[in-house]
Curated annotation (Swiss-Prot):
Protein's UniProt name: Protein-lysine N-methyltransferase EFM3
One Pfam family, short name: Methyltransf_16
Record family assignment: Belongs to the class I-like SAM-binding methyltransferase superfamily. EEF2KMT family.
Residues where Phosphothreonine is found: T177
GO molecular function: protein-lysine N-methyltransferase activity
Domain of life: Eukaryota
Amino acid sequence: MNEDLFYDRLHQRCPGKYLLEELETSKSNDVLHASRFVCEMELVQKTNAYYCKTIVKMLLDHEWIFAKAFTIVNDGEDEIEIYDYLYEKYIKLLSTGKPDPMMKDVVRYRFDEDVKIKIEETPNLISAASTTGFRTWEAALYMGDFLIHKPLQELAPVQGQDDGKKKLNVLEVGAGTGIVSLVILQKYHEFVNKMYVTDGDSNLVETQLKRNFELNNEVRENEPDIKLQRLWWGSDRVPEDIDLVVGADVTYDPTILPDLCECLAECLALDRCKLCLLSATIRSESTVQLFSQECNKLGLKCTIVTSTEYDANNEIRAMKALQFKPLIAPIRIYKITKQ
């Protein structure tokens, strides 16, 4: 394990037990800079003091494993004794209890060395205020992982722009925390002209989504045009200039499937849009069958592109790299096109 990966694990809230296993099995002895270690631990404490406390205790209890994985060097003006720092930190955090379920955290998800997404979320909250968009769900992480390994420009045809470059206009439906759109923008910003990031909850769009895009605001040349807006399926019209639709965990509620499928059909009726990609956690086969039936009624073809059921490597990678625990149910990615 190198130093960058170690900090990425901390900012993604990797459980201490799993982090310890990675340190113990690390075959390299990488350099760890004491001054950076202190800065990173302070950042972790600032956003999640209880998690910081559990990591500090784990490192103190297994000092020899930490020492085996890293060679600690002092590169600042003042020499820092790491274990003295950890001991003092643990004493300060001793009274810190488990966080309230409503507590917000800023989690930084690592999809690869170059794509790391910060998300402000409430990870212990399933739903509130009639929305499930306050936390990042497994299907969104799986979709992000899929898009990292399957080049966006190979997934959908693109239209030539006036400057001769070929770029996509992408629509995300049911964006929630916005992590799928953020992955696309970080990984493929040079291939994206316009990104519509939408959700049916106006309040969520104006608060949660806006906040997460602010957290990941990196100024680049020729930055895509990003639009955060409400899209209520069956009521609001879809943008007419889109090439690709993406969505994650939007098929969980059977009562909204007719409106969702109508929205997808409206998108695919546009001249430019040829493909919708949806990731779905398979909590109920009956809901999946209903989704397929609704698609069929509207002349849409629904095909499984990949699934954790059929590809053990996908499941292992998604579990180990993105959430560090078994999946609650299989996840599939569907391709929806016109029949």
